């Protein structure tokens, strides 16, 4: 598997890199959480801007992300607006979603930018090109909170993300049974073995899928989300346990 090197953090090599999500409403609470996270044993902080009370104000978004960049010091910053259709807090029109992404790129503060595969649609390749021109790596994401698609569909979707030049395809599915967790893990292995052009991020959600968040190094998932006190998705495991298990399973 290839790796993505962002300021010395080699995503796709060795232990999966740990992401902590910020899901606070106010700028003050966001920055307070960022200050706490800046001292924790994690590699990256995700700002879930769909939780931000000022999400409709470009000026408020720009100000907050600029302050976040300073507060997080050497931690990587992933900026995400998770749309309602993919399990997020807010709905945006297609035009509003594109405007948000371009605003974040203009701030020159993000290390990584989440771009939803289906929400971006035909604009995906151009958005990825714009992000790369701004020096920002792209996490191209797809989430299914109702089910886990078949392995072939999971692989096909991640390959399409690679073909659009995404740096890190990301896919999450909700398992209805144990076999669904195995399907997602098998898709992850197939990507690592047969399509190693990029690292990938995968997870099976909920309590049933929690094992997928901890065994990424064995199966080929390059990053995992940990719960530092408030989860941003079902099945996230606490940071202390994540670090302990990742160390225990390190190859």
Regions found by a protein language model. Name each.
Residues 102, 112, 117-251:
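Catalytic alpha/beta core domains of metabolic enzymes, predominantly
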């Amino acid at each position: 598997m290839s790796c993505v090197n962002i300021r010395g953090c080699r995503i796709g090599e060795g232990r999966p890199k740990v992401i902590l999500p910020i899901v606070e409403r106010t700028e003050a609470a966001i920055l307070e959480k960022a200050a706490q996270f800046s001292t924790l044993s994690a590699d990256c902080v995700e700002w879930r801007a769909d939780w931000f009370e000022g999400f409709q104000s470009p000026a408020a978004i720009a100000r907050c992300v600029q302050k976040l960049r300073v507060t997080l010091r050497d931690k990587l910053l992933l900026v995400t607006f998770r749309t309602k259709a993919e399990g997020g807090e807010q709905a945006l029109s297609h035009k509003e979603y594109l405007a948000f992404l371009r605003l974040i790129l203009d701030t020159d503060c993000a290390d990584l930018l989440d771009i939803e595969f289906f929400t971006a649609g035909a604009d995906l390749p151009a958005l990825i090109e714009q992000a790369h021109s701004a020096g920002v790596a792209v996490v191209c994401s797809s989430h299914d909170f109702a089910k886990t698609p078949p392995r072939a569909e999971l692989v096909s979707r991640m390959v399409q993300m690679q073909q659009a030049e995404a740096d890190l395809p990301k896919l999450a599915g909700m398992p209805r049974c144990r076999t669904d967790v195995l399907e997602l893990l098998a898709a992850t292995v197939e990507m690592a073995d047969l399509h190693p052009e990029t690292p990938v991020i995968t997870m099976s959600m909920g309590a049933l899928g929690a094992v997928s968040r901890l065994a990424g190094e064995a199966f080929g998932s390059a990053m995992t989300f940990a719960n530092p006190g408030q989860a941003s998705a079902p099945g996230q495991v606490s940071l202390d346990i994540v670090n302990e298990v990742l160390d225990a399973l390190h190859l």
